[in-house]
């Protein structure tokens, strides 16, 4: 949590660190339930379908960026055939700012992100080398396969903004790959996420 958001974050009740039950969500008497993943609020959800919430008078929202993925067997995030881009984030910011009647703030945030992206592209676009990146998010153990950002994921987008490409070629949004595969890809940069 960013230091400037720590105080606000401390006021938010955590229902679970994984997947909440529908009962635990409804016990909060929500007016609105957003979700990033269809797994949490979709047709095959482990929590509820949007129709279930509508039946009890609760409005809901599912992130449009994740909804754009194609379902892949055994992967809750699916696969993405086209490189993720900021359009998805801008749509979500615009939607939330409209829902919460703060459209001016939403548009200001979008403008700030667009400027920051343009500045990064200008700075890193000068590079003469097409750097290859691997974005490592976690592993079950130090010797286990790596959970990484897939070719067309947001990680692939970040690599493109930095003037390079994702060394992982899988279209799966968040594939698990062997360290041998990573070594064979011979990335110039390995980004280690702190989750």
Locate predicted features.
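A short, structured surface patch at a secondary-structure boundary
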Residues: 1-43, 170
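Short, structured coil segments at secondary-structure junctions
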Residues: 8, 55-57, 162-163
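Acidic/histidine-enriched, beta-strand-rich ligand/metal-binding domains
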Residues: 11, 169-181, 185, 189-195
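Short hydrophobic/charged patches on amphipathic alpha-helices used for structural packing
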Residues: 22-26, 156, 179-180
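Structural recognition of the beta-strand scaffold that forms the well-ordered cores
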Residues: 32-36, 60-63, 131-137, 157, ...
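A ligand-binding cleft/hinge motif common to bilobed small-molecule-binding domains
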Residues: 40-52, 194-195
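Extracytoplasmic substrate-binding proteins
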Residues: 49-142
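Alpha-helical, coiled-coil/dimerization segments enriched in small aliphatic residues
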Residues: 147-174
């Amino acid at each position: 949590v960013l230091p400037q958001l720590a105080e606000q974050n401390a006021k938010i009740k955590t229902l679970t660190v994984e997947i909440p039950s529908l009962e635990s969500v409804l016990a909060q008497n929500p007016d609105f339930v957003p979700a990033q993943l269809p797994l949490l609020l979709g047709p095959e959800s482990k929590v509820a379908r949007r129709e279930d919430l509508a039946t009890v008078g609760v409005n809901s929202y599912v992130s449009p960026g994740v909804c754009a993925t194609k379902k892949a067997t055994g992967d809750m995030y699916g696969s993405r055939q086209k490189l993720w881009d900021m359009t998805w984030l801008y749509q979500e910011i615009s939607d939330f700012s409209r829902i919460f009647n703060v459209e001016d703030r939403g548009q200001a945030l979008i403008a700030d992100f667009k400027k920051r992206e343009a500045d990064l592209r200008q700075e890193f676009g000068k590079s003469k080398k097409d750097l290859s990146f691997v974005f490592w998010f976690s592993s079950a153990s130090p010797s286990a396969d790596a959970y990484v950002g897939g070719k067309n994921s947001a990680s692939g987008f970040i690599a493109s903004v930095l003037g390079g490409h994702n060394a992982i070629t899988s279209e799966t949004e968040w594939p698990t790959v062997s360290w041998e595969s990573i070594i064979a890809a011979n990335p110039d940069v390995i980004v280690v996420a702190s989750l």
